[in-house]
A protein has these predicted regions:
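Alpha-helical transmembrane segments
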Residues: 91-106
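Internal/C-terminal transmembrane anchor helices
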Residues: 111, 115-134
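Hydrophobic h-region of N-terminal signal peptides that target proteins for export
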Residues: 8-17, 126-128
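Juxtamembrane/start-of-transmembrane alpha-helix segments at the extracytoplasmic/lumenal side
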Residues: 78-89
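N-terminal pre-domain segments of enzymes
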Residues: 18-51
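Surface-exposed recognition segments
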Residues: 19, 149-166, 243-244, 266-269, ...
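A short glycine-rich, aromatic-capped structural motif
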Residues: 48-78, 137-192, 204-207, 287-288, ...
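Short, well-ordered surface patches within globular domains
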Residues: 66, 180, 196-257, 293, ...
Length: 359
């Protein structure tokens, strides 16, 4: 029976498997989940009935590579000096042409243009266009780099350094963050403060979330699947869905508004799951609504050694990912990391589960 492994970086986040497993084919970054599922001979979705009309829906997350964390922007190839040279060329030629036209107007003389003059004039126009284009291109690249550098410097240090990660096995992730009706169906209680069946379950600790996974796994035993919280790498990979932008939907606040409930559009409360647009993997509420517990203890990225292990665990805190209905927009970015003690319960904190094959 195949098993699904946790995500592992190419260089630094390798996880030792209990026994050898065959990697799944890697996603090419462009094909649809349905096309990948067909190529990998896997189901694109899975659904489990919890009774009384309550269902758990999962979507396939392909195996693949991505850059985890906030990368430093690449310096533009064109320099400020080349931009200044281009400006100088364009301005000089413009001045020459303007002087010629003014001289002609003042003297009233008509100049006869020979073929040589015509060629020189054409060359001057070409150089002017070239200079202006180079100047504009340089200006755009320089401004984009400066904006990217300002953004990079403003990010939390624990999102750096960016590092390559390899997801060796495809896995299934909850299409929605866990809901109150799902929690009620499995655990029998509902600790949420903002009660509504389709709202995210909130005010749950990491211990509560793992207890939910354990009990759900008992119910799923006959299906050969078990539930658990995602690793941090699995979560970010699934959230990004092949993107490199601030949010999986883009870089602007308007892009976030289309996919997430956050501080400026939530009205100070969580909302029913699936009310905004999904990412390209088919996952909802990854950048907003409620934060989500991950399996991992918190570790700074720079503390990882070549074997992918670290003794620098920040107490017993567990990783939190995702946006929140209480947060400003930039805090909902795909790379943002949080961590709290595992017994923390907050009204903007829930969880999402993944499925792995039971041994």
């Amino acid at each position: 029976m195949r098993k699904i492994c946790l995500a592992a970086p190419l260089l630094a986040l390798s996880l030792q498997a209990a026994e050898p497993s065959i990697p799944d084919p890697l996603w090419d970054g462009h094909e649809s989940v349905a096309a990948y599922a067909q190529r990998a001979h896997l189901d694109a979705t899975k659904t489990f009935d919890l009774g009384n009309g309550v269902k758990l829906e999962f979507v396939l997350i392909p195996a693949g590579r991505f850059i985890m964390g906030t990368p430093e922007p690449a310096k533009p190839e064109i320099t400020v000096l080349s931009a200044q040279v281009s400006i100088g060329i364009g301005a000089t030629l413009s001045l020459i042409m303007l002087s010629y036209l003014l001289l002609r107007k003042r003297t009233g003389r008509r100049f006869s243009f020979s073929l040589r003059w015509l060629m020189a004039f054409s060359l001057a126009c070409s150089v002017m266009v070239w200079g202006g284009t180079r100047w504009y291109s340089a200006l755009v690249q320089i401004r984009e780099y400066e904006a990217g550098l300002d953004w990079y410097n403003a990010m939390n240090d624990d999102e750096k350094p960016a590092h390559p990660v390899l997801i060796t096995k495809a896995f299934y992730m909850g299409k929605y963050v866990g809901t109150q009706e799902q929690y009620q169906a499995v655990i029998g209680t509902n600790p949420s403060q903002f009660k509504w069946p389709q709202n995210p379950v909130e005010s749950v600790s990491w211990f509560d979330a793992t207890a939910f996974c354990k009990k759900l796994s008992e119910q799923l035993r006959a299906s050969a699947w078990k539930a658990q919280l995602p690793s941090e790498a699995q979560w970010e990979y699934a959230c990004r869905a092949g993107t490199r932008t601030i949010f999986h939907s883009g870089n602007a606040d308007s892009d976030l508004d289309a996919v997430a409930w956050y501080g400026l559009n939530s009205g100070g409360k969580p909302h029913p799951v699936g009310g905004k647009k999904a990412n390209s993997f088919g996952l909802y509420d990854m950048n907003g609504n409620v934060m989500q517990w991950c399996q991992d203890p918190y570790r700074p990225y720079e503390s990882l050694n070549a074997a992918g292990t670290s003794s620098d665990v920040q107490g017993d805190r567990r990783v939190l990912r995702g946006g929140s209905y209480t947060w400003y927009s930039k805090a909902c970015r795909s790379t943002n990391r949080g961590a709290n003690p595992p017994d923390t319960r907050l009204t903007n904190l829930g969880f999402r589960i993944v499925l792995v094959q039971d041994k």
